[in-house]
C-alpha cells in the first residue's frame, strides 16, 4: 500500500505515519515544510519504506514538484491524508469580530487549509485514478460546518475549513466517475 501523508512531520500527521508503518505500508511519503527539522524525521527516516519530501502548500511550484517526485516513485497511491493546517501563526490569529479581518491573513489561511489539498490532488491525479481503491482524506474541523456555527468569530479559519469541505466533496464526486 502506497500512502502519502501531507503534513506528516509532526502532530496528527506524525501519529498517522506511525500507524501506517505499523499497518504494513509498502511506501510512505511524508511531506513537511522542512522535513529535516520535523520531529518525525529522526523517528521515521531510518525506515527504508519512508520518503520525506519538502512541501510548502502555499507555493504552487512546490506542490507541483512534490507531485512529480511521488509520480516518479510509484504507479499509484492508495491513501492520501492531508493533515497540514493552520489556525494561527505570527500575527495571524482567530478573529473575534469582522473588524479584525485582514485580507492577507484570510488568503493565507485559504492557501494552507483549503487550496493545498486540492492542488496536491490535481498534481497527483494520474496516481489517484484507476482500478484501485483510493482513500483521499483531508483533516477539517467542526468549525468548518456552516450549520454548526453558533458562536461566530474565527472568520478566516471557519471559511477556509468550509471551503476545504466543499473542495473535498467535489473531488470525491469526480474521483467516483
Regions found by a protein language model. Give the residues of each.
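Conserved N-terminal Rossmann-fold NAD(P)-binding element of oxidoreductases
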Residues: 3-8
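Conserved glycine-rich Rossmann-like NAD(P)H-binding loop of the short-chain dehydrogenase/reductase
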Residues: 21-40
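A short helix-coil junction within the Rossmann-fold of NAD(P)-dependent oxidoreductases
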Residues: 23, 73-74, 90, 123-132
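Rossmann-fold cofactor-recognition segment
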Residues: 44-61
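Conserved Rossmann-fold cofactor-binding substructure of NAD(P)-dependent oxidoreductases
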Residues: 57-76
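Catalytic loop of short-chain dehydrogenase/reductase
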Residues: 86-114, 129-177
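A short, exposed helix-loop element centered on a Lys and neighboring polar residues
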Residues: 121-122, 169
Amino acid at each position: 500500500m502506497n500512502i502519502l501523508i501531507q503534513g506528516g512531520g509532526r502532530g496528527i500527521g506524525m501519529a498517522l505515519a506511525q500507524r501506517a508503518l505499523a499497518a504494513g505500508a509498502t511506501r510512505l511519503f511524508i511531506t513537511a515544510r522542512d522535513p529535516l527539522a520535523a520531529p518525525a524525521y529522526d523517528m521515521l527516516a531510518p525506515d527504508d519504506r519512508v520518503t520525506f519530501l519538502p512541501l510548502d502548500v502555499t507555493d504552487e511550484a512546490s506542490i507541483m514538484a512534490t507531485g512529480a517526485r511521488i509520480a516518479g516513485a510509484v504507479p499509484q497511491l492508495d491513501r492520501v491524508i492531508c493533515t497540514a493546517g493552520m489556525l494561527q501563526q505570527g500575527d495571524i490569529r482567530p478573529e473575534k469580530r469582522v473588524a479584525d479581518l485582514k485580507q492577507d491573513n484570510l488568503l493565507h489561511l485559504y492557501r494552507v487549509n483549503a487550496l493545498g489539498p486540492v492542488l496536491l490532488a490535481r498534481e497527483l491525479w494520474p496516481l489517484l485514478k484507476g482500478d484501485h481503491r483510493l482513500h483521499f482524506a483531508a483533516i477539517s474541523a467542526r468549525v468548518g460546518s456552516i450549520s454548526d456555527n453558533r458562536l461566530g468569530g474565527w472568520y478566516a479559519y471557519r471559511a477556509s475549513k468550509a471551503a476545504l469541505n466543499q473542495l473535498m466533496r467535489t473531488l470525491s464526486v469526480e474521483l467516483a466517475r
